[in-house]
């Protein structure tokens, strides 16, 4: 695992990464059968084994039943409402060399970033469509899209939107706290893959290469005061079942530790 920290990176004392990686190493989807899937679908509360069974090849014959159960759970907790948001890219500069990404720092593409006036013009136009939630994104470049720049963007967004999410490079807790004071509510970070070896092969250089720092980003965001955090994997880099399993239990462990947060 590539774990040489950059000087600016904050280390936190957390056992969540160890727990997740331990569970993933033990994951074996071949040990589940149709009876395990049926049993999981009939439960009110799932164990890790139940979750694994629903992700296993044995569950492929139960897609309709799984979709129906998922719909029921969604309606139970969220009703029939749908929350809509729009993404707004502020910049596409990046400091990382990720082999699968067109934004990577070695690609010869046109780069740019919005001025504050351009941001506000975009936000004004978006808000006039009736949307009240926005997701602010950048490429992962601290030099071209620094925290102050993003903070000013969040302040502008606060004039037009009731909910503001950010999907940028991972930050330290104090930087997340600053963006929260500016008006940000939610943070999304994609781990891409939870397999450390595959992660290292796909992230050749840049801060993103440091697996632990990225993994702990959501926890730093929570300690920085963010109301909610999002998780994700780029399915296909590694074993998609393992990565889906890891994404779910990463969120589970964080919510167990911080029960007040939204996932």
Residue map of PLM features:
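Short, small-residue-enriched loops and turns at beta-alpha junctions
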Residues: 91-92, 140-145, 236-240
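Short Fe-S-cluster ligation motifs
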Residues: 121-141
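Short amphipathic alpha-helices and their capping/turn segments at secondary-structure boundaries
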Residues: 124, 173-183, 245-257
């Amino acid at each position: 695992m590539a774990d040489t920290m950059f000087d600016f990176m904050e280390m936190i004392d957390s056992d969540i990464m160890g727990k997740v990686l331990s569970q993933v190493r033990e994951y074996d989807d071949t040990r589940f059968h149709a009876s395990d899937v049926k049993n999981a679908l009939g439960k009110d509360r799932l164990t890790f084994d139940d979750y694994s069974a629903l992700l296993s090849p044995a569950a492929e014959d139960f897609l309709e039943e799984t979709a129906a159960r998922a719909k029921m759970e969604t309606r139970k907790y969220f009703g029939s409402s749908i929350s809509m948001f729009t993404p707004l890219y502020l910049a596409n500069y990046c400091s990382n060399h990720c082999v699968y990404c067109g934004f990577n720092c070695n690609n010869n593409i046109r780069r740019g970033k919005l001025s504050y006036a351009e941001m506000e013009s975009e936000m004004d136009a978006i808000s006039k469509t009736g949307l009240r939630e926005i997701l602010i994104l950048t490429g992962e470049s601290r030099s071209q899209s620094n925290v102050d720049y993003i903070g000013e963007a969040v302040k502008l967004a606060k004039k037009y939107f009731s909910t503001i999410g950010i999907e940028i490079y991972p930050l330290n807790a104090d930087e997340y706290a600053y963006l929260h004071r500016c008006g940000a509510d939610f943070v999304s970070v994609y781990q891409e893959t939870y397999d450390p070896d595959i992660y290292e092969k796909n992230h050749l250089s840049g801060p993103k290469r440091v697996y632990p720092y990225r993994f702990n980003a959501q926890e730093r965001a929570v300690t920085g005061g963010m109301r909610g955090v999002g998780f994700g994997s780029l399915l296909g880099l590694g074993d998609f079942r393992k990565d889906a399993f890891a994404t779910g239990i990463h969120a589970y462990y964080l919510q167990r530790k911080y029960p007040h947060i939204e996932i």
